[in-house]
């Protein structure tokens, strides 16, 4: 069989190039709903994260603005360029797995006291560095010591404003293991963009990052964050 190896260098990121499906959706005639989310808005703007210029296009208002999830009325998107669209072109490589993700996986393992050949803090920082390098973004060392926190979402049309989803910083928290896990997964979530399914799976698995509730909740307000476990598996471990 074949083997694939993702090393601890951004030039070993696994990707492939073809007609990028996100570009196909975003550029489809009459479809305007592919925009930045409010949660990404809060984290990238609050952290003043320089990757936002790589991930998203400026809105017509000259800022990076997202929208709360769950709007029923599609008219909120129409006739207004005040929202940021994905900065993804037809030939933008589609990422499968990155060196940054590997570092964050190791950081989480180290936090659980597994032998990951590094401390949680060192691996967390290496994950951020790898993400910056992957996207050709500079000033990562300044970012790593930043005490900035996620921003309040100011709202957009019928998309209501909301307090900041979290109070974590980029600079490593030395006091709380819980906060450290939140930092690791939040930065992993940012670095995974635009892999929405993987990012959603991280939230379901860990509860992080802290995200905004959707505007119209059709599930009764209950979102399961647990991984389904079969009855047979449970009985085998009783």
State each model region's role.
Residues 1-8, 232-238:
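Conserved small/polar residues in nucleotide/adenosyl-binding loops
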Residues 180-235:
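Extracellular low-complexity, Gly/Ser/Thr-rich intrinsically disordered linkers
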Residues 2-3, 7-106, 111-112, 117-175, ...:
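Hydrophobic-face positions in mid-chain alpha helices that act as interaction patches
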């Amino acid at each position: 069989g074949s083997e694939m190896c993702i090393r601890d260098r951004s030039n070993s990121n696994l990707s492939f190039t073809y007609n990028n499906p996100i570009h196909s959706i975003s550029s489809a005639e009459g479809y305007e709903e592919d925009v930045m989310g409010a949660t990404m808005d809060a984290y990238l703007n609050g952290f003043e994260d320089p990757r936002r210029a790589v991930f998203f296009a400026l809105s017509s208002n000259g800022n990076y603005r997202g929208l709360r999830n769950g709007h029923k009325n599609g008219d909120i998107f129409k006739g207004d360029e005040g929202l940021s669209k994905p900065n993804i072109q037809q030939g933008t490589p589609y990422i499968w797995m990155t060196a940054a993700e590997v570092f964050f996986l190791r950081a989480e393992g180290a936090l659980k006291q597994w032998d990951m050949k590094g401390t949680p803090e060192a691996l967390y920082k290496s994950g951020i560095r790898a993400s910056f390098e992957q996207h050709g973004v500079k000033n990562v060392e300044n970012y790593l010591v930043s005490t900035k926190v996620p921003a309040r979402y100011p709202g957009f049309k019928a998309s209501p404003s909301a307090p900041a989803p979290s109070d974590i910083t980029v600079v490593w928290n030395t006091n709380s293991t819980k906060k450290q896990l939140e930092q690791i997964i939040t930065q992993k979530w940012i670095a995974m963009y635009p892999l929405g399914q993987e990012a959603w799976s991280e939230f379901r698995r860990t509860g992080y990052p802290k995200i905004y509730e959707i505007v119209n909740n059709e599930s009764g307000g209950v979102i399961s964050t647990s991984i389904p476990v079969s009855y047979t598996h449970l009985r085998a471990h009783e």
